[in-house]
From Swiss-Prot:
Disruption phenotype: Deletion of pvcA and pvcB abolishes rhabduscin biosynthesis and decreases virulence of the strain. Involved in the biosynthesis of rhabduscin, a tyrosine derivative which is a potent inhibitor of phenoloxidase, a key component of the insect's innate immune system. Catalyzes the 2-oxoglutarate-dependent oxidative decarboxylation of tyrosine isonitrile. It is an enzyme of class 1 (oxidoreductase). This is Tyrosine isonitrile desaturase/decarboxylase. It comes from the Bacteria. Keywords: Iron, Metal-binding, Oxidoreductase.
Amino acid sequence: MNTYEIDCHVELVKPFGLLITPNYPEQDINSLPVDALRKLAQDHLLVILRGFQSGFTDKEKLTEYTRHWGELMTWPFGVVLDVMEQSIPSDHVLDSSYIPLHWDGMYREAIPEFQIFHCVSAPEAAQGGRTTFVNTEQLILDASEDEFNTWKNTTITYRTKKVTHYGGEVVSPLVCLHPKGNKWVIRYNEPMHQEDKYADHHSVTIQGLLSEEQKAFEETLYNRLYDPRYFYAHQWQSGDMVISDNFSLLHGREAFISRSPRHLQRVHVHGMPVCENNSFRTISDSNSIDSTVKEV
């Protein structure tokens, strides 16, 4: 394994990814070349930095560091999202509930290449709250020809009201070419649980399938996505930084016990060139397509 001559300890994570830890006490995360880390993240899809000094609980320091990775995606709240339970949550992201597998930027005009997570404080293992990742790149490589062709010919429509900082309609093939054009990846947002209580509960419609056929398709796909060969659940430790490839991985979250000390910060980094999202368009508050908004 090529570690690109970074001064640290590197080990493989099963079933995919790398765990990078310091070579000496008090080693600062800024001692690791960003270009080398970016290459590792592109090759291994998931890079976990554990045990380094960073000071990233200060949002300004986190923002300054992540700017070295590339152009940052800006949201109405800024570039850093505090992912933590709120007393009156506006959606499931800011609650303690599970989050279904998805890709970030699906309801935006551009899709970021990386998520960079920093763990301010971690829950105990028994409290839940692991972040889940699925290596769709490898899943497709291992799929049968019939399975791949079925997925490649499947188109899914997702719709959600804009009640927080995202919303709209996405019409996307289940299998897409990676933005760099050299491999196939899966773009999928799992259905929410029926008992989900939030207004941003999204709908999932698979074109050409009746209701029972869609349910069977979703169950089959669920079993493939959660196959241990492609599925990794990250147990957070305070101070962890995780860089994940948003093009090749899907990610989600396990539910956690309410009022657990789970606090992550998340930043999105664009690729070069920026990946335009041609599958997205806005919808009006009445849920009809807003024809006055340019489709991207």
